[in-house]
Curated annotation (Swiss-Prot):
The keyword Protease does not apply. Its EC number is 1.1.1.250. Belongs to the short-chain dehydrogenases/reductases (SDR) family. Keywords: NADP, Oxidoreductase. This is D-arabinitol 2-dehydrogenase [ribulose-forming]. The active site is at 166 (proton donor), 181 (proton acceptor), 185 (lowers pka of active site tyr). GO terms for biological process: arabitol metabolic process; carbohydrate metabolic process. Pathway: Carbohydrate metabolism; D-arabinitol metabolism. NADP(+) binds at residues 28, 49, 181, 185, 214, 216. One of its GO terms (molecular function) is D-arabinitol 2-dehydrogenase activity.
Amino acid sequence: MDYSYANVVPNFRLDGRLAIITGGSGGLAAVISRALLAQGADVALIDMNLERTKSAAKEVLGWGEETLKGEHASAIGQVSAWSCNIGDAEAVDATFSSINEHHGKIADLLINTAGYCENFPAETYPATNAESIMKVNGLGSFYVSQSFARPLIQNNLRGSIILIGSMSGTIVNDPQPQCMYNMSKAGVIHLVRSLACEWAKYNIRVNTLSPGYILTPLTRNVISGHTEMKEAWESKIPMKRMAEPKEFVGSILYLASETASSYTTGHNLVVDGGYECW
């Protein structure tokens, strides 16, 4: 048995790697992109609104230049911004190809945070809304995974896919009437298992990170002035609080690392403060 430092202590550095983050202008992507940049990765942000995504990319790079000084200065990578509807397979494929060409390397880390939730009672859920959320959350997760994996397979390169699921993919969180969101996230979790089995032979690991309630800017706006809603949510969490976005960074770095999680694939990592325990 080799007990050398490198063989025992996991390495979370991402030097030389290119990470694609969908939903790139969102609250969760903001902290994830900074963490990946700090670990030496190049980062490509994708979202629907190009100007908002460019602004997010500029903020991330500015943060890197200000924060990663001294011994880490040389580790600051590139940050690029792209516009794409992940529910459009052809657009996804073209965007991923452009990203690889722009950065001069093939992306080997994908983090899909894109997706949305909406509430309608099941008996009155509009068909067009149901189709739309399944196209983005469900098919979009497949399209980005497919376009990411193809060049890796063609060039015999390894990679890691992290699809953001939700605790709502395995439980029904009362009192929100969000059956189609729950269905879409359940689909993401099982998609991950399927892709993990198919692509293990190509050294492409596929995992789900399923959050509970996160205090993103959007969530803060929703609960602002609604004390009863906030208290109702938190009462069902054993830790009695919602998560800060930064509390998901460790899980992302674990699943991204080729040493820490080299034998982890097809897994649904739930980070929910214990919500599912009750």
